[in-house]
């Protein structure tokens, strides 16, 4: 007897693009935490990897301003159509949307930062990470957040977490440590677990020194992450509510 493989996550995103924002509204606290962990400056160019409907764009635009550039990448044309409507509605002329798999997305020039918000399949793709990291300047901040397999001592949560994320993840390989491949590109990657170990925030910098800025010490990087955590995730109440919505 053979078991049918689950449909790729891209089908779920395609079918749910119209109401994706409503379904993931509770997850906004994680998005805020993610963007707050990036030391963005006005005028920066940031890569929003697997941007979906563009829910991170307002937060990013607030940081980089009209002089900055936001490049959203997603292979779902249905999700990007919603993102394009959001961009038009806000009148942003500095947001570029690329409809392509992240591994082969044609990214022009170099960016100053990248974020990965609830994109497990992309985080497990070496080719996707290679393409993104190849377009980041030395010393660029990188941040990722999403769900993960709860720790063994939280085993009652495991079936529930898997069921919650199954529509949006094609392959659960690496779900115990979703950041493992990213850590190979970002040697100083720091990881904090969220939602009773069922979620995570990973923040680090690409190797090298970022130009036109005094490089941050490890102590300063740790302080930045801790401040973001205290501001957006006091206790476990916020991440737990966010977890209810899945991606």
Predicted regions mapped to residue ranges:
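Conserved class I S-adenosyl-L-methionine
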Residues: 1-39, 160-165
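Conserved beta-strand signature within the Rossmann-like core of class I S-adenosyl-L-methionine
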Residues: 139-147
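Class I SAM-dependent methyltransferase SAM/SAH-binding core
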Residues: 47-49, 53-103
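Short alpha-helix
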Residues: 169-185
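Core SAM-dependent methyltransferase catalytic element
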Residues: 187-215
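A short acidic, Gly/Pro-enriched loop at the edge of an enzyme's catalytic core
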Residues: 103-114
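A short SAM/SAH-binding and catalytic strip from SAM-dependent methyltransferases
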Residues: 113-126
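A short glycine-rich, Lys/Arg-flanked "PGG" loop and its adjoining helix->strand segment in the class I
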Residues: 128-138
């Amino acid at each position: 007897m053979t078991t049918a493989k689950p449909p790729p996550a891209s089908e779920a995103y395609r079918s749910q693009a119209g109401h994706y924002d409503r379904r993931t509204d509770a997850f906004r606290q994680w998005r805020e935490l993610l963007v707050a962990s990036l030391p963005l400056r006005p005028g920066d160019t940031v890569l929003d990897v697997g941007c979906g409907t563009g829910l991170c764009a307002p937060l990013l635009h607030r940081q980089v301003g009209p002089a900055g550039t936001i490049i959203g990448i997603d292979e779902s044309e249905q999700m990007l159509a919603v993102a394009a409507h959001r961009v038009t509605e806000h009148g942003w002329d500095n947001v570029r949307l690329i409809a392509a798999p992240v591994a082969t997305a044609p990214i022009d020039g170099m960016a100053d930062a990248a974020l990965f918000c609830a994109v497990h399949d992309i985080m497990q793709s070496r080719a996707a990470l290679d393409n993104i990291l190849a377009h980041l300047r030395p010393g660029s901040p990188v941040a990722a957040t999403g769900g993960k397999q709860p720790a063994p001592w939280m085993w009652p949560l495991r079936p529930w977490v898997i069921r919650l994320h199954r529509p949006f993840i094609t392959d659960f390989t690496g779900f115990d440590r979703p950041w493992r491949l990213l850590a190979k590109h970002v040697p100083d990657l720091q990881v904090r677990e969220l939602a009773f170990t069922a979620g995570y925030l990973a923040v680090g910098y690409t190797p090298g020194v970022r130009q036109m800025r005094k490089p941050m010490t490890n102590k300063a990087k740790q302080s930045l992450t801790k401040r973001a955590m205290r501001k957006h995730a006091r206790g476990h109440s916020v991440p737990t509510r966010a977890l209810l919505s899945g991606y």
